[in-house]
């Protein structure tokens, strides 16, 4: 959440308004601990509407709770949309991404899936 305030200020915005569902608390790793999805798609940086969203989607973070305490941000990228797939244990998320992540043009979105663990991950565009 601090990122949202800092980025808004860096962009010349005055203040941030968070949507009620900006932070989702749920067990993503299957270990019984609360993990968090932070989705800034409905967050507003007043006077700077494109701060958190653009053609590649909106800022989206996954923060997991570690077994020995503390938290780790395992994913931080812009996504167009996401879907948590059904199933027991660690959750798999389908991410809708800018087409560039699949070698397509930006106007053609693509999907990638990832099973959530405590290991950080990111999607990279092909070279």
What residue spans do the PLM features occupy?
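Acidic, small-residue rich beta-repeat scaffolds with periodic aromatic anchors
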Residues: 1-2, 6-11, 79-127
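Beta-propeller blade termini
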Residues: 15-30, 77-92
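Residue-level detector of short, conserved catalytic/binding motifs and their immediate flanks
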Residues: 20-21, 34-36, 60-61, 112
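Sec-exported extracytoplasmic/periplasmic mature domains
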Residues: 9, 41-42, 68
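Beta-propeller blade repeat segments, especially FG-GAP/WD-type strand-to-loop junctions
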Residues: 3-5, 47-74, 108, 113-120
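Acidic/hydrophobic-patterned starts of short beta strands in beta-sheet-rich repeat architectures
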Residues: 28-41, 88-98
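Short, conserved, GDST-rich strand-edge loop motifs in beta-rich repeat architectures
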Residues: 42-53, 98-106
């Amino acid at each position: 959440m601090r990122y949202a305030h800092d980025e808004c200020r860096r962009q010349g915005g005055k203040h941030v308004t968070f949507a009620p569902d900006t932070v989702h608390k749920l067990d993503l790793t299957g270990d019984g601990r609360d993990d968090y999805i932070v989705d800034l798609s409905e967050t507003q940086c007043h006077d700077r509407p494109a701060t958190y969203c653009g053609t590649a989607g909106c800022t989206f973070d996954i923060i997991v709770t570690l077994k020995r305490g503390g938290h780790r941000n395992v994913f931080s990228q812009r996504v167009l949309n996401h879907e948590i797939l059904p199933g027991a244990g660690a959750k798999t998320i389908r991410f809708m991404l800018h087409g560039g992540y699949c070698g397509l043009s930006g106007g053609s979105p693509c999907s990638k899936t990832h099973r959530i663990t405590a290991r950080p991950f990111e999607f990279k565009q092909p070279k």
